[in-house]
């Protein structure tokens, strides 16, 4: 009698337990959806057991991070341990001076980790340009996924305690849960301790029918944005343009920039939708992270709608700390520029990110100046004339796209080449041929922008429709969406863009 071979089974188990840099565990992968289904079955058993639930979620979160960054899950544990004890010290300290030194220690530890892993080679490159190539050797430093997100999240906890807005947690596991919670661990939204921590020890954990339905809707829309729109237009159009801009006409270069604007929105907001949706299925609420940003009529409005958790973090912990708008107009404009420069640097250690931040900082400062000197310029939303709002949306979108060109291009030479093609080799006569040649990509780009520009009430109607549908119908919709994803997805899993930050 021959026993069935089990090598294949154990190979798969070993693969599940092994870190592979080329195969991170991401929300849009079939593996994650399979593991999450099993995770939810066990999670439901801990509905009335807060401590067991906390430990179980922490273990899964650390496994999730291990599959993305390997041994560097220990860095996450170190960050949680460090700020847990520093926060207790800040709260216990009797003098303002001692509290200040402790919060500075927290900031130094967090920014020190970020600086080492993210900016060491950038600083070495600057030194080599100043003192000659070979002055310093580049280091082989691994960048842990999502380090910028959990560092900011951890700093907000100690700063809030220093400001007297929060009391420190008594249980280290609660803080590790807050910092490592897997739905938002690697790409946000950047959580706020005062909003999230009160939810940790719910007993019993409550997932209402509305929460469940909304969670399903957000997961499905996130999958659609990421796997069907973002990945497809990236692989089949946008990447080709940015890789070899001289091979394409100015129209194609412009379409590539517009395509990237949609790609990065669908990629990042798709992740945020899935993160918020998964959290809802677990009984936790996160605030909205995107609010149709390309409907913005001003750059200020854009930053109220784009990556809301980062823009509010920069406002509350950097811009206001610099003085905000309390120290005169010139200082206000300078604070905006500094905040956005550092926001650009937060995204990555490269000149292109600094220039991207400088562009947005200068635009925000100029818009604030414009509002100060032009009567009626503060009008927003429905108070604007329709033609004024339409013109504002067109101008703001193209300004943002100029920023995306710098953000996406691998070098400033690529920026120059694409702008040259747009202004000197547009080749409008080729537009019909280009559109027919990339029919699938252009159809998705058009559909994506049309869906994005639909009235908010249409989105709310769709959400209510899905969230109030019978469970069987929700399962059918989920299965249909997964089938569609399988039909259009590339052979290789495409990581989320913001994983690199």
Segments predicted by a language model, with ranges:
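Membrane-embedded transmembrane alpha-helical bundles that form the catalytic cores
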Residues: 2-451, 455-500
